[in-house]
Amino acid sequence: MAETGDKPYRAEYAKSGRASCKKCGESIAKDSLRLALMVQSPMFDGKVPHWHHYSCFWKRARIVSHTDIDGFPELRWEDQEKIKKAIETGALQEEKGGTRKEVGKAEKSLTDFAAEYAKSNRSTCKGCEQKIEKGQIRISKKMVHPEKPQLGMIDNWYHPDCFVSRRAELGFLPAYGATQLLGFSILKAEDKETLKKQLPATKTEGKRKGEEVDGNVVAKKKSRKEKEKESKQEKQLKEQTELIWGIKDELRKVCSTNDLKELLIANKQEVPSGENAILDRVADGMAFGALLPCEECKGQFVFKSDAYYCSGDITAWTKCVAKTQTPNRKDWVIPKEFREIPYLKKFKCKKQDRIFPPEAATVNSAPPPPASAPLTETVTAPQDKPLTNMKILTLGKLSKNKEEVKNIVEELGGKMTTTANKATLCISTQKEVEKMSKKMEEVKDAKVRVVSEEFLKDVKSSNKGFQELLSLHAISPWGAEVKTEHQEVAVDGKCSKPANMKSAGKVKEEQGPSKSEKKMKLTVKGGAAVDPDSGLEDSAHVFEKGGKIFSATLGLVDIVKGTNSYYKLQLLEDDRESRYWVFRSWGRVGTVIGSNKLEQMPSKEDAVEHFLNLYEEKTGNSWHSKNFTKYPKKFYPLEIDYGQDEEAVRKLTVSAGTKSKLAKPIQDLIKMIFDVESMKKAMVEFEIDLQKMPLGKLSKRQIQSAYSILNEVQQAVSDGGSESQILDLSNRFYTLIPHDFGMKKPPLLSNLEYIQAKVQMLDNLLDIEVAYSLLRGGNEDGDKDPIDINYEKLRTDIKVVDKDSEEAKIIKQYVKNTHAATHNAYDLKVVEIFRIEREGESQRYKPFKQLHNRQLLWHGSRTTNFAGILSQGLRIAPPEAPVTGYMFGKGIYFADMVSKSANYCHTSQADPIGLILLGEVALGNMYELKNASHITKLPKGKHSVKGLGKTAPDPTATTTLDGVEVPLGNGISTGINDTCLLYNEYIVYDVAQVNLKYLLKLKFNYKTSLW
């Protein structure tokens, strides 16, 4: 059962007469029964009730079960029965005079279901996502969209067969029939007969066992014992409801609100806000006993429809998730001063458990449930189906019919679509690609990769990686990189190492489809950018006093509630006059949900005071406080802003290359390393919210704090920590590193693979932070080209190697010979070879120069990481990072097979150029291992670790270059079969054991065709 906050409806008695019905617009009388649709507010990150008169409500919604209604058990018994009857029959109407009448089921049209002939071929079936052709019969389920309630009831169209297969899910009860569809009467006679057969009205209790309605099993006739049990439960629930309402009615007569508060205080119960809530708490205590505090957090339990929920907090970051139907209680005390009231004097409290109705399995009612799913349904990690979250389009004649293809796609976790710009992949034939029909042109324009039908067969049964299969079966020269939620596993299935550990053998896939970057033009003045939503970006600047900029971005994440909120606050000062404004904006991260407010203040003093008050109200802290303290349900300040140095970075990149003194290949390399768009693209792939976390303020301290949280959560998951602990750490992590999940609930960090994916994300963010810091740092030199300025910041001497030289021939042979057989999705072409010498690195390496067993080995990384690598060297993960994120512990990893390291360049067909390093590595005595081992300290006498692979370069072909071994032989079997690794890995734990020698620019030629 969904937690109450996730229920799509609410019922209560109107607290006042101020609310208006969203259907008829008339006011809802105080104390009358009202029902609400819970919809996403367009103004803030949360849901709001759209209240209706009881009679109006049924014209806008069709409820499948009363368990979908928050507040249902708190209604009077007769109103509970009235709602149940309306749900069962769908036939209760209320006339204007207030009288009620029953309408025959066959006579009454269902206002939220309709049938008609498609007016065009533009509509798409919500079931199969195929087009509904013009003139075809289509059936609509009308719904209020939770994110766009202002549009009212919207048609969601289905093919008749698709509607029938989802009958129960869409709330078309067995008691309903085709004749009740709006528009049924004007259909053709033969179509009416067909629909009647497909959607018959059937009683819920048939004479035959297992009776079915188009595949939907109707409830079997209940046994006598079941009926007696239900009757007994109903009787108990009725008596309980009447007891509670009897207490409430009497208390209203004899006690004031202050009296009720005193009763709660006397029984050590929290006093809630609102007269009705106070009355409910007192009535519950008098009926069942005073509630004892939550054992986990000492918070107050509160009744909410299906259980008692703790309202306390585990920590300042996380709400307590304890809930129970049998909370501990003590006797309810009536203080002496209240015994003068006859009713309270004679009242005797009997300590007992509250009775709850048996949980009913609910189906999705309309409107659809909120985007935030219950905690138990939260997607915490990538799914094990390879096509999860993908939409597949088919074009042309395939060997299997559309229904067979659809079944295979759905079995693999995907869905079908008919729209090119919604598709993740297109399945077609080489003939169709060559023919280039109008539909195929749409596919090309949408940059959707086309694969052959064999892809479906292989992705289901092959041991090859997903990206490898994509490249193998691709039949179009175009196509963006396809991101998958499926994680690759070792080919032989024996390796216990997750695919995304820092072992260069597998390509780690990011989660879900990439989100398009959100762009906002920022006007930077002085210390910070003025938020353009204020409308004052051209005439005002952010106020500054005592070196402190009066601008704050705050975050609040609550995974249980599905909250992912931001709050921005700025004090603005006019550029010319003595005028001041306080601007604030708020909403949900990564969506258009939210609003803002601009207030002009009478004076500077008033503006400052208002800013300080708002900051304290939202965070619980003083603006001038040096040590921030996080408080429950309060926002946390993020160490970011809009990026004060954006303009400086723009100047450095806009005219790059016009007067550079560097060789052209080196110029191109520097442009590639410092490409801001590539950095932004990488961040978007990581689901980072670029509006709240721009490149300019990825502070190292913030990233290190995030590492610490991942370390804690990894430990908690490994040790079987409590749900509350994992929730708390997840909330802290997503607050610190704002993520754009759209309307989805932030996923729990409850899976080791997902945690390790986030570790890798932070590894990359650290290097991006270094690159951007270099870009914006230092002084401008009008005589120097921006490329030359950036080159100098790397503090690395870079020379182009002549491709006909002996060293170039050896390196190219090394690339050619050590391309692993299983990495056959692409070929590698050497575009450029650069000899590199990092400032001070050879001096640091000197003590290891005499160590035996020095080899020239490969190390691959994203292009966005190379500014950090060249300026600071290859680094070991910080102490804060979890050790289990790396197969052999925290070290620097190398390979002797080029493609093993090349997989870490994260190239794609759309972006096929990558960078890879060759480093001289002092290995000395190697500690040889066959399986994962989280090394924190090497055994005595060992200088490095070698992860033994099944295939390695032929040792007889090893050559030397400047006295260093180059293992450039062709890959052959090592004869080691009981190992986790396909290929060798080399790890050193001291950065001084590495001396980087070469940097290669490689082109990844992806195999796009079988022919």
From Swiss-Prot:
Residues 224-358 form the PADR1 zinc-binding domain. The gene is PARP1. This is Poly [ADP-ribose] polymerase 1. A motif (Nuclear localization signal) lies at residues 207-209, 220-225. The keyword GTP-binding does not apply. Zn(2+) 3 binds at residues 294, 297, 310, 320. GO terms for cellular component: chromatin; cytosol; nuclear replication fork; nucleolus; site of double-strand break. The two PARP-type zinc-fingers (also named Zn1 and Zn2) specifically recognize DNA strand breaks: PARP-type zinc-finger 1 binds PARP-type zinc-finger 2 from a separate parp1 molecule to form a dimeric module that specifically recognizes DNA strand breaks. InterPro entries: ARTD/PARP, BRCT_dom, BRCT_dom_sf, PADR1_C_dom_sf, PARP, PARP1-like_PADR1_N, PARP1-like_PADR1_Zn_ribbon, Poly(ADP-ribose)pol_cat_dom. Its EC number is 2.4.2.30, 2.4.2.-. GO terms for molecular function: damaged DNA binding; NAD binding; NAD+ poly-ADP-ribosyltransferase activity; NAD+-protein mono-ADP-ribosyltransferase activity; NAD+-protein-aspartate ADP-ribosyltransferase activity; NAD+-protein-glutamate ADP-ribosyltransferase activity; NAD+-protein-histidine ADP-ribosyltransferase activity; NAD+-protein-serine ADP-ribosyltransferase activity. It comes from Gallus gallus (Chicken).
